[in-house]
Amino acid sequence: MERIKELRDLMSQSRTREILTKTTVDHMAIIKKYTSGRQEKNPALRMKWMMAMKYPITADKRIMEMIPERNEQGQTLWSKTNDAGSDRVMVSPLAVTWWNRNGPTTSTVHYPKVYKTYFEKVERLKHGTFGPVHFRNQVKIRRRVDINPGHADLSAKEAQDVIMEVVFPNEVGARILTSESQLTITREKKEELQDCKIAPLMVAYMLERELVRKTRFLPVAGGTSSVYIEVLHLTQGTCWEQMYTPGGEVRNDDVDQSLIIAARNIVRRATVSADPLASLLEMCHSTQIGGVRMVDILRQNPTEEQAVDICKAAMGLRISSSFSFGGFTFKRTSGSSIKKEEEVLTGNLQTLKIRVHEGYEEFTMVGRRATAILRKSTKRLVQLIVSGRDEQSIAEAIIVAMVFSQEDCMIKAVRGDLNFVNRANQRLNPMHQLLRHFQKDAKVLFQNWGIEPIDNVMGMIGILPDMTPSTEMSLRGVRVSKMGVDEYSSTERVVVSIDRFLRVRDQRGNILLSPEEVSETQGTEKLTITYSSSMMWEINGPESVLVNTYQWIIRNWEAVKIQWSQDPTMLYNKMEFEPFQSLVPKAARGQYSGFVRTLFQQMRDVLGTFDTVQIIKLLPFAAAPPEQSRMQFSSLTVNVRGSGMRILVRGNSPVFNYNKATKRLTVLGKDAGALTEDPDEGTAGVESAVLRGFLILGKEDKRYGPALSINELSNLAKGEKANVLIGQGDVVLVMKRKRDSSILTDSQTATKRIRMAIN
């Protein structure tokens, strides 16, 4: 106050005002401040002052030949005076206008290609819809977000190689383009940018925007996909938000979204198989998302989600060191603990073995709809500060924190038995048992927790056991805050290990992730996910299992028919027939299997009764463990479309229909593929298959002994000849090939040669 009074007094004297307004600025310190260094100290002022001059711009001397001295209005465009300190000319802003209107034009064909990301952004904004503005408190939390819509997911190094190859192909330097995406992008861009006149540096800069994911750690209250982040400044302020729907989607957001869905489906499916880890890897390697191999996406995509991280861990990739519990990401910010096995009694006197964390620790908890700071000591919640979008979200966070605290009153609040199981019908571990129990109903937990009076702290209020806010009382140690808790910002990745039950541990042995943490939320993927693995056939229901099983047999028919005749047991045990078993009524599985296997054996024994279509049709039924019974069936039942449908043993049905004219098979009305060979040739099919590896020499030759059956052929040595009985009792002479390489042609030539030999 004193200083201000003093200044007021000074200003009231006219001499002071005169000194301040009229004196020249020639004080050395001031001159130094504004003239030292290349950095402009007051750019706005400099700009205004420059533009007030007649010739504020300098240009290359060549401009004098390219621009007239005066424009149509007779205004001077450039001055004959040289720019002090360089050999450039001084130019008027009017020259720029003249150049824009009358200057040389060039082809614009490359602009949309080079500035693709900008053109696409304009389109998205043009078609986007902005809704009303709402004024309300914004709970923003900093999250790592993608700020660059429409990019591929190359690493900085991969992108650098692509850019060098496209923009500076003749520069020296080793460039290794290895990944599929690198090669494709390089090829496309080279084509697009032929004869491009845009400055190479600009092209390189724009290519980088297209190829590399750029992330920033920004405060966000709403959507986090890149098409929302690009308009963050328009959609959320400190106390307002504006509704916005993007006018288009970009592939990178779609990849992230589809990757999460694929990973969740795969982890859920792997959990119920005999060897979860092996199954998970098999599925990751055989799945494509939007036409790109899932394993390639996993290697490049930094998305952090429980299922995605489990898949990454299985592939030996590093993942974030934070751990997951109850759908929240926990990051320890201070403290430490040791784990001790302990037996505790629930309120129902059930004994639980839990690993108790002994020691004081602090964590941040970040979920989709709520965040919190948790301070705990051994079996004690010290403090929980939680913020969330609504009552429900806040309650979810409180339950997870209370269970995680391992407090006795939480364990005693259990009513009834804990027997939750996972998808594979295995009991969950005790901590997840407790979590599931209270997620179903937390009333007793909240009632038994205890409440305490609270102090009035800015931005904090209390919350009562019925989840209503209060300024007087609160659940013991729990407060609700207006401020969110930031996500963990570090992008550090750590080496982890994974066991066959898909539990992911850090190097100290702490569990970071397990299948229990994978969300059950179902979504519809934006990009097509193609699961080639038979384990994923059931994801689209029984019909898809049926169609896929038959498609698989037809695609692999050449190999299948050889196995059918030479090693049926191995064929019946193929995992591709596993999903099909769930369609066959439980009571009938063994009987159907026994019946079909007997039928197949008769076909092998009695030559000439071979029927390709029938084998394909009945094969999946033979995969179940067979029951020995003399039962005969004319039709077999499968459970699809909510009821039992019949497959006729002889003849077509709506489920399995083979069209002789087109040689195509339809299953439930869906095309399941074409049979490449002609099933009407009776035995030719299996014989040409079985005679692979044999050369047909001609008619029977008595010198080589009695005719063998097809099954006995496998005992011949290479180069050995024998008579063999085929088809309708005809006998031909064959020789076992010395080389395996020509086997492929055998089955085609065999059919022709058999006919010649017989006729």
From Swiss-Prot:
InterPro entries named in the record: Flu_PB2_2nd (IPR049110), Flu_PB2_6th (IPR049114), Flu_PB2_C (IPR049115), Flu_PB2_CAP-bd (IPR048298), Flu_PB2_middle (IPR049111), Flu_PB2_N (IPR049106), INV_PB2 (IPR001591), PB2_helical (IPR049113)
One annotated GO biological process: DNA-templated transcription
Source taxon at top rank: Viruses
GO molecular function: RNA binding; RNA-directed RNA polymerase activity
Predominant cellular place of this UniProt entry's protein: virion
Gene3D superfamilies: Polymerase Basic Protein 2, C-terminal domain
A GO CC term attached to the entry: host cell nucleus
Keyword DNA-binding: no
Protein keywords: Cap snatching, Eukaryotic host gene expression shutoff by virus, Eukaryotic host transcription shutoff by virus, Host gene expression shutoff by virus, Host nucleus, Host-virus interaction, Inhibition of host RNA polymerase II by virus, mRNA capping, mRNA processing, Viral transcription, Virion
Motif, Nuclear localization signal: chain positions: 736-739
A UniProt-annotated Pfam family: Flu_PB2_6th
Subcellular location: Virion; Host nucleus
UniProt site positions, description: Avian adaptation: E627
Function: Plays an essential role in transcription initiation and cap-stealing mechanism, in which cellular capped pre-mRNAs are used to generate primers for viral transcription. Recognizes and binds the 7-methylguanosine-containing cap of the target pre-RNA which is subsequently cleaved after 10-13 nucleotides by the viral protein PA. Plays a role in the initiation of the viral genome replication and modulates the activity of the ribonucleoprotein (RNP) complex.
Subunit architecture: Influenza RNA polymerase is composed of three subunits: PB1, PB2 and PA. Interacts (via N-terminus) with PB1 (via C-terminus). Interacts with nucleoprotein NP (via N-terminus).
Family as reported in the entry's similarity comment: Belongs to the influenza viruses PB2 family.
HAMAP family per record: INV_PB2 (MF_04062)
Protein's name in the database: Polymerase basic protein 2
Gene name, Swiss-Prot/TrEMBL: PB2
